[in-house]
Swiss-Prot record:
<comment type="function">
    <text>Catalyzes the reversible oxidation of malate to oxaloacetate.</text>
</comment>
<comment type="similarity">
    <text>Belongs to the LDH/MDH superfamily. MDH type 1 family.</text>
</comment>
<dbReference type="InterPro" id="IPR001252">
    <property type="entry name" value="Malate_DH_AS"/>
</dbReference>
<protein>
    <recommendedName>
        <fullName>Malate dehydrogenase</fullName>
        <ecNumber>1.1.1.37</ecNumber>
    </recommendedName>
</protein>
<dbReference type="GO" id="GO:0030060">
    <property type="term" value="F:L-malate dehydrogenase (NAD+) activity"/>
</dbReference>
<feature type="binding site">
    <location>
        <position position="81"/>
    </location>
    <ligand>
        <name>substrate</name>
    </ligand>
</feature>
<dbReference type="GO" id="GO:0005737">
    <property type="term" value="C:cytoplasm"/>
</dbReference>
<feature type="binding site">
    <location>
        <position position="87"/>
    </location>
    <ligand>
        <name>substrate</name>
    </ligand>
</feature>
<feature type="binding site">
    <location>
        <position position="34"/>
    </location>
    <ligand>
        <name>NAD(+)</name>
    </ligand>
</feature>
<dbReference type="InterPro" id="IPR001557">
    <property type="entry name" value="L-lactate/malate_DH"/>
</dbReference>
<dbReference type="InterPro" id="IPR036291">
    <property type="entry name" value="NAD(P)-bd_dom_sf"/>
</dbReference>
<dbReference type="InterPro" id="IPR010097">
    <property type="entry name" value="Malate_DH_type1"/>
</dbReference>
<dbReference type="Pfam" id="PF02866">
    <property type="entry name" value="Ldh_1_C"/>
</dbReference>
<dbReference type="Pfam" id="PF00056">
    <property type="entry name" value="Ldh_1_N"/>
</dbReference>
<feature type="binding site">
    <location>
        <position position="153"/>
    </location>
    <ligand>
        <name>substrate</name>
    </ligand>
</feature>
<feature type="binding site">
    <location>
        <position position="94"/>
    </location>
    <ligand>
        <name>NAD(+)</name>
    </ligand>
</feature>
<dbReference type="InterPro" id="IPR023958">
    <property type="entry name" value="Malate_DH_type1_bac"/>
</dbReference>
Amino acid sequence: MKVAVLGAAGGIGQALALLLKTQLPAGSELSLYDIAPVTPGVAVDLSHIPTDVTITGFSGIDPTAALVGADVVLISAGVARKPGMDRSDLFNINAGIIKNLASKCAEVCPTACIGIITNPVNTTVPIAAEVLKQAGVYDKRKLFGITTLDVIRSETFVSALKGISLADVAVPVIGGHSGATILPLLSQVKGVEFTAEEIATLTTRIQNAGTEVVEAKAGGGSATLSMGHAAARFGLSLVRALQGEKGIVECTYVDGGSEHATFFAQPVLLGKNGVEEVLAYGDLSDFETNARDAMLEELKANITLGEEFVAG
């Protein structure tokens, strides 16, 4: 199993590469790519960690060498948020980066599963889909927006608020991956009761958690380490499913036939071909139903923006 990380010299990419080097199954290959010249050195640094995962690093303008034979491609390339920016401010730079990298994936590893971390995910995933369609290699089972960070934040915040073990907390998160499009289904957390005020406060905190980190880092970066962990969790789940492990479910932003929007995040059963089944997300509270319905105009506009970017 070969996993490629594109954007591997950045804050997310390095954290992700470290976790993959230590946690991928024995015999896996890990290839790192970034435009930054430091990337081969990152691979050398990680190669000194004693695990049965071989690692190579490539830099420059062409990611081809990193993509040859890849089964999974995780893309974190792009610029990060700074104070005062929201995810949509990233669009102007990151849209072109994703378009180019998706085009290379279509050319070099057309059957690979692609997980997109680069924000704004609501828009960058549709960009990748349109590029893959134009190349004639689009398989909607193999393209994912990685929204796992919203899930782990939800679980962390619920655990802290209620004083319960994280092992006992599972929070599905649906919709998209920015602001009001992030909808944690707190009504589905088993064995926990929330007041209406707690639900409103928690939901807002989860939706704005990225800004919390950007402001706390005071211009020194965005949520790189927690995002690296979230991307590793998703990537490792995907690898295990591709290798035949059954019953692996992750929330992820996919082209899954949702009644709400072309792309929508919800629980997905992963399998040997990527998406095995998009699962129903179950019953919502009135608060959640209203929040879902209220987000759809923004989410659909984000998707259209990506589609139109590729169409020119």
